[in-house]
């Protein structure tokens, strides 16, 4: 994040937020709706609570505000007539029948119901805060000009494809040493397979932020990413995504996608929206691109949902081999689904008639929870090596053999790989070693959830059980 963005964010924080005023008004109305007398202290205290929760636990704040707004909206007419809830009002509510209830509802003035609707409407507005703020954040991230200085452009292939997987552990894939034959395509296709590639961090936003962007003082410069580098080099760029485009965990990465010449998302909201969208729906988009002959070098990016928890949502509950729990079994089957997508994409590229090279890697791995139990599942973590052990493979139109590369590689060096792979040289990228080789690259550090650099070798182990 560069100084311009930091300054703008600080300016926003210094400014008086209209949301603080809305929270104050809603807190006041909730207090009055429940029949309590006006209290500046209680109103201010609840406003501060909402602001604190928004900063540290936004989903909890939304739940609290939603429940309080709904209860206040419903109780407002009663509160004005009978006062604050107490034992007698609760007893009366419990003992009343339908006829008595309908009679009570008719005695309240119409404006009491109108006020209740107003309270409910304010609650809805408050619950929509994230989307509006994320749209503003997206505009900020997407609007900053890149600072790449391209010094040479010598692409070896006409089409370059980057497939970004999601939550795939390397040891869950047969092609990378996993115990299950669940990746028939990757296990046999010619290409370069990296058996010791380490992700930058343990969650999508943190990991891809450090992988896809130039990093200065441990801070991703979102304007200087691999897409803007390709744009500067004269490539035509495409981004097709099955991830979210607006949301707490999506906006920063989606802002990279927005830098492409063409960007299309299967989901309208965050990553949890439209859960039934499938990764293979992206193939119709790549087919359209490949159907037209183009003179410019092409960069096509596919961002998958892959193996994101819950895995059974990805597979519609389907799995091939039962391992410990249904969720674990579904997780293994997501690897087969991704493998088949890569097979279909590879076939499309072959049929295009153009030279091509495809790289696939996952953003991060997962760790086991409730290990050994019938409810065992996998989730995000940052304490184990397996959280960072992910697949990385390069398949090219001129690959002659299925080659295994054992040298350790770090996602922190992805831009160096991208530069060497595409033939795009830039003053800001220093190539310390040849990425596709057995050349040693030095120690690898990951970034944990506290944004601390940790030596990968010092992490614990979370092996995949065979049961």
Model-predicted regions and their roles:
Residues 333-336, 453:
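Polyampholytic, low-complexity intrinsically disordered segments
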Residues 2-22, 30-34, 55-62, 73, ...:
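Membrane-interface soluble catalytic domains
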Residues 126-163, 167-318, 387-389, 411, ...:
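Active-site-proximal alpha/beta segments of enzymes that process anionic O-linked groups
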Residues 239-241, 299-306, 332, 357-362, ...:
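Short beta-strand segments
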Residues 161-162, 337-376, 418-419:
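Metal-dependent active-site segment of extracytoplasmic phospho-/sulfohydrolases and closely related
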Residues 2-129:
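Transmembrane and membrane-interface helices of multi-pass
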Residues 315-332:
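A solvent-exposed, charged loop/short amphipathic helix patch at secondary-structure junctions
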Residues 177-181, 354-355, 361-397:
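Histidine-centered active-site microenvironments of extracellular/periplasmic hydrolases
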């Amino acid at each position: 994040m560069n100084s311009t963005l930091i300054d703008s964010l600080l300016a926003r924080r210094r400014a008086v937020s209209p949301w603080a005023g809305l929270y104050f008004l809603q807190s006041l109305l909730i207090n009055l709706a429940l029949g309590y007398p006006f209290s500046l202290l209680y109103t201010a205290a609840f406003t501060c609570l909402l602001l604190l929760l928004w900063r540290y636990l936004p989903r909890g704040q939304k739940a609290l505000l939603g429940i309080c707004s709904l209860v206040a909206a419903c109780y407002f007419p009663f509160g004005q007539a009978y006062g604050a809830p107490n034992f007698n009002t609760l007893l009366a509510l419990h003992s009343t029948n339908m006829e008595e209830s309908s009679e009570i509802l008719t005695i309240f003035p119409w404006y009491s119901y109108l006020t209740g609707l107003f309270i409910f409407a304010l609650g809805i507005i408050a619950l929509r805060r994230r989307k509006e703020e994320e749209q503003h954040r997206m505009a900020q991230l997407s609007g900053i000009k890149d600072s790449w200085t391209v010094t040479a452009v010598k692409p070896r292939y006409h089409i370059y494809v980057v497939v970004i997987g999601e939550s795939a552990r390397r040891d869950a894939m047969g092609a990378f040493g996993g115990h299950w034959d669940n990746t028939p395509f990757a296990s046999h296709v010619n290409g370069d397979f990296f058996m010791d590639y380490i992700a930058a961090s343990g969650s999508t936003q943190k990991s891809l932020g450090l992988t896809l962007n130039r990093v200065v003082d441990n801070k991703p410069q979102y304007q200087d990413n691999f897409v803007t580098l390709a744009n500067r080099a004269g490539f035509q760029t495409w981004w097709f995504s099955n991830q979210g485009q607006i949301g707490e965990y999506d906006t920063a990465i989606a802002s990279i996608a927005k830098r492409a010449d063409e960007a299309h998302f299967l989901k309208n909201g965050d990553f949890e929206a439209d859960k039934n969208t499938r990764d293979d729906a992206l193939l119709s988009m790549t087919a359209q691109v490949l159907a037209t002959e183009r003179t410019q070098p092409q960069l096509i990016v596919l961002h998958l949902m892959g193996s994101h928890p819950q895995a059974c949502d990805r597979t519609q509950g389907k799995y091939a081999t039962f391992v410990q729990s249904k969720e674990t079994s579904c997780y293994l089957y997501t690897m087969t689904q991704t493998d088949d997508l890569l097979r279909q994409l590879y076939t499309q590229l072959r049929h295009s008639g153009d030279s091509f090279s495809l790289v696939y890697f996952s953003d991060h791995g997962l760790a086991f929870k409730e290990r050994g139990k019938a409810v065992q599942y996998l989730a995000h973590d940052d304490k184990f090596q397996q959280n960072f052990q992910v697949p990385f493979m390069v398949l090219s139109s001129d690959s002659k053999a299925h080659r295994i590369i054992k040298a350790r590689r770090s996602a922190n060096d992805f831009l160096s790989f991208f530069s060497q792979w595409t033939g795009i040289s830039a003053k800001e990228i220093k190539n310390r070693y040849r990425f596709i080789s057995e050349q040693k690259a030095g120690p690898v550090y990951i970034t944990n959830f506290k944004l601390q650099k940790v030596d990968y070798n010092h992490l614990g182990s979370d092996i995949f059980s065979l049961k």
